[in-house]
Amino acid sequence: MSSRNLVSIAQAVRDEGGRALIVGGWVRDELLGRTPKDLDLEVFGLPADRLRPLLERFGRVETVGESFAVFKVIVDGDQDAIDVALPRRESKAGRGHKGFIVEGDPALSVEDAARRRDFTINAISRDPLTNEIVDPFDGRRDLQGRRLRVVDPRTFGDDSLRVLRGAQFAARFDLTATDETKALCRSIPLDDLPPERIWGEVEKLLLQAERPSIGLALALEIGVVDRLWPELRALVGCPQEPEWHPEGDVWVHTLMVVDQARARLDDLPRGPAAAMMLGALCHDLGKPETTAVIDGRIRSPGHEEAGVAPATRLLDRLNVQSLDGYDVRRAVLGLVAHHLKPSAFKKAATPVSDGAFRRLAQKVDLELLARFAKADCHGRTGTFDCSAMDWFLDRARALGVEHAAPAPLVMGRHLIELGVRPGPRMGELLKRVYDKQLDGEIRTVDEGLSAVKQMLESET
């Protein structure tokens, strides 16, 4: 919403005897010098039956929450809507995020309304008419000191999701939680959280923070990892060979890879970006099962394939499937199962064939794999040669398979024209001719049909 329309609404509220304040993340982001999103207004001193007609002067009004009076205002010519709400009075009536009785209360004071917020950095408001900052819980001071501090310890645990929100806020805004905040988060049960709400916070942590490792480290410290993600907890203390991983155990390496991956995905759509970050989180989940001392060195043979099962379990816990039509789960498991392939292909004793690239492209996006493998290579202390990933991607691009394997030239309809009936035999013939195509022996439909005819002749 334009600042002019915002001020006009605030003036109209004032003329009716109320006060409108910008609240929440918008004010926090402004104070941090970031571009704010999702403008929210809280209106004091006006009941809902007077507020709605006032808002209708400015555009279309949709009711989002009847019981606690939240209105979405869509003004003609404005790209974004604005949420306008009465201050809320909440009382806990049961477990979970739905176990609340919430009522709009226009008589609530600004301080009491801010008290229901989770952290002090989100309890700051601004008057759009005077630009006065209203900050009853010293959120600005905490922003300046990069502190994450709970507003009201007595009610913070009413919604256990706030524990995960704390981790993602720490990551996004580079905050350090106070000792009181950490102790409080450890004490709050998390078993009432549905996977969808957990994933919502994890996605923000992974995709919106420059250094997601900050939030993941806090999640470990406050017991989130232990209680929600045992697959990740198993990485803590899992040793690695110091020559290849001087940074420490698998957990430390994973945090470094997560940050490296985050630095390489700003040009990706949401689905592939989420797959890249989840791949970073999951890529070495097979190491706890496979790590052993072999010939005096710490090794993890087969950890790529061994990581698929725990990665699947973790994705199940988060209920991650597809995002915006992109199969995130398939992409993540492909990255886990094949994350060493770029380096292995480059170091192979004999040159890796074009067919090997084409076959690998059936299982995973090779551009995403190369991008991730580079993050994995750089996710260590020390200096390592990571040029194999560039070589790998150049080969994939030269073959035109960086995002997918080539489509089959010969289809079932072609075989029907040759008199082959649908069934297992047709499937076997299609597989054999496609294998030849992957190996570069077939480049056109005609060449493919000639190969099929030879196969049919050899059967007689």
Regions found by a protein language model. Give the residues of each.
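Catalytic cores of the polymerase beta-like nucleotidyltransferase superfamily
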Residues: 1-460
